[in-house]
């Protein structure tokens, strides 16, 4: 839309075309009331839910994304974008923790029965101590580490929870708060755990993503490209001419890299809020945002020639708390869709063997192929040797028996994402309870995984609905449940909003619909 150096005016400007920005735009398009525009510095929509393709044809998401949903409106929107049965694969989550050479079913704390006897004893000891202490505790845990100790005890804390969470967050659990936990961490039932140990049984199926969907083609990014296509081209500015250089909150003007200026009445911002306040040049808010912490994410992909090994089987994602590999999670990405890697007839050269040695031949050969996607966190408290990370990760795959030294690696991928995880730090709420209202007082709704910085509502469905609900707040003053009451939305099926019913409702009521008079 539009050429350089122009001036545009809209009622609502949406910055960012990841899930949150697209949620806002989708709702604005559905309401068909206020004028609006969505902008993004990337040519391709999707944000942190995008997908890259290697030169050899292997797909890798920006980390481990799967579709499970708490909202019918979200389901409606992605089903509209990808409406056919063959657009999707549905999977049972098959997930394990690697511990002392064993594959322990996830969640670890519910499957102590799989551990060596001495670890079982330490885990049960700790759980009993924790259960007894919890009975007399009259204060809430001060931090995530204290929560772990109170709910699981020292055995599980030392075996899994402390080392694993440090690998994920790149911050010790002592420095994290625990209000974010909700459905994110399974609390063990001591009686059930002991019962499973005696009967040598495992427990599984816990959590919101015990089953999930994955797109057949184009990875997770394909979902958001398809959602963006349901929006009119005239209201999208993606790429260089969608790159924000300045936000003047007082004048309600946003300047873009090509010189274009957009005047707005209300702004839905989904870029990282620390970047937003820098673009605003507001020293007070910049200083406030400095107490928001985040970790960076390295995504590493390894494409391998050969049939998927039996030891890998139909595993989905795997957790690695130990220090024999740099990654905290591995996803068998080729299990999600047969189109996440080149087809069998595609001829590729072997780039290296698993042990790093050169192949005996550079001849192009057929598949089949399978792939692994790895995630490594980085922060000032957990630095990463970036130069050797790919090599160290492949060695980690050998150390954990995921691949063999002689396996033929035909493709590798490594990309660093500066803003990977918004850390639920001890300081977080103190910042957000001042920063987000201060922005809203200036008619800026900052929302999204990093726009509002709340990890507990940072999945794709949550992120999308943060945008939808921001628009409803702007247009009719509706309460934003996802932002303000995460436990409430996570504990129910949210069916109040629907795409089709809503569209008819808006069409019927449009003549009499009241839109915020400032719009």
Cite the ranges covered by each PLM segment.
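C-terminal segments that line or cap access tunnels to active or ligand-binding sites in enzymes
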Residues: 264-266, 270-445, 452-456, 461-466, ...
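Dinucleotide-binding Rossmann-like beta1-alpha1 core, especially the glycine-rich loop
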Residues: 56-136
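Conserved Rossmann-like nucleotide-cofactor binding loop
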Residues: 20, 44, 274
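Active-site/ligand-binding neighborhood in enzyme catalytic cores
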Residues: 112-113, 120-252, 270
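Glycine-rich FAD pyrophosphate-binding loop
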Residues: 29-55
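N-terminal Rossmann-like FAD-binding beta1-loop-alpha1 element of flavoenzymes
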Residues: 7-38
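Core beta-strand elements of the Rossmann-like FAD/NAD(P) dinucleotide-binding domain
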Residues: 8-10, 257-266
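Active-site-proximal substrate-binding core of FAD-dependent oxidoreductases
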Residues: 416, 474-519
């Amino acid at each position: 839309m539009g050429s350089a150096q122009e001036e545009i005016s809209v009622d609502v400007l949406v910055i960012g075309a990841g899930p949150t920005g697209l949620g806002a735009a989708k709702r604005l398009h559905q309401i068909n009331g206020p004028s609006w525009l969505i902008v993004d510095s990337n040519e391709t929509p999707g944000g942190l839910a995008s997908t890259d393709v290697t030169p050899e044809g292997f797909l890798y998401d920006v980390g481990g994304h799967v579709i499970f949903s708490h909202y019918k409106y979200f389901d409606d929107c992605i089903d509209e974008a990808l409406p056919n049965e063959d657009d999707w694969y549905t999977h049972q989550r098959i997930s394990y923790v690697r511990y002392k050479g064993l594959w322990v079913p996830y969640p670890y704390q519910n499957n102590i029965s799989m551990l060596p006897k001495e670890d079982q004893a330490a885990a049960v000891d700790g759980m009993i101590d924790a259960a007894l202490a919890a009975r007399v505790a009259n204060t809430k845990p001060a931090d995530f580490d204290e929560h772990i100790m109170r709910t699981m005890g020292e055995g599980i804390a030392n075996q899994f929870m402390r080392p694993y969470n440090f690998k994920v967050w790149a911050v010790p659990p002592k420095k994290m708060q625990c209000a974010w936990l909700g459905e994110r961490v399974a609390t063990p039932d001591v009686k059930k755990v002991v019962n499973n140990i005696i009967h040598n049984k495992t427990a599984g199926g816990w959590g919101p993503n015990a089953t999930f969907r994955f797109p057949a083609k184009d990875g997770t990014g394909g979902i958001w490209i398809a959602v963006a296509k349901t929006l009119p081209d005239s209201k999208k500015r993606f790429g260089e001419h969608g790159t924000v250089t300045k936000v003047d909150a007082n004048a309600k003007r946003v300047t873009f890299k090509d010189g274009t200026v957009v005047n707005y009445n209300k702004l839905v911002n989904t870029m990282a809020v620390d970047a937003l306040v820098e673009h605003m040049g507001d020293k007070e808010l910049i200083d406030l945002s400095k107490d928001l912490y985040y970790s960076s994410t390295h995504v590493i992909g390894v494409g391998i020639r050969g049939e998927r090994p039996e030891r890998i089987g139909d595993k989905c994602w795997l957790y690695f708390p130990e220090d024999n590999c740099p990654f905290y999670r591995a996803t068998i990405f080729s299990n999600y869709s047969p189109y996440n890697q080149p087809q069998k007839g595609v001829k590729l050269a072997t780039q290296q063997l698993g042990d790093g040695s050169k192949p005996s031949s550079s001849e192009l050969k057929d598949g089949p192929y399978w792939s692994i996607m790895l995630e490594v966190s980085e922060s000032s408290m957990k630095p990463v040797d970036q130069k050797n990370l790919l090599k160290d990760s492949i060695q980690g795959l050998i150390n954990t028996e995921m691949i063999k030294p002689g396996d033929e690696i035909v493709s590798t991928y490594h990309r660093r994402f500066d803003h990977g995880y918004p850390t639920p730090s001890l300081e977080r709420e103190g910042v957000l309870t001042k920063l987000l209202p201060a922005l809203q007082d200036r008619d800026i709704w900052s929302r999204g995984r990093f726009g509002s910085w709340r990890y507990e509502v940072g999945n794709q469905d949550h992120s999308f609905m943060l945008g939808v609900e921001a628009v409803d707040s702007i247009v009719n003053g509706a309460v934003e449940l996802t932002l303000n009451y995460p436990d409430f939305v996570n504990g129910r099926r949210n069916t109040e909003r629907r795409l089709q019913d809503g569209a008819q409702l808006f069409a019927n009521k449009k003549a009499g619909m009241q839109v915020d008079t400032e719009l």
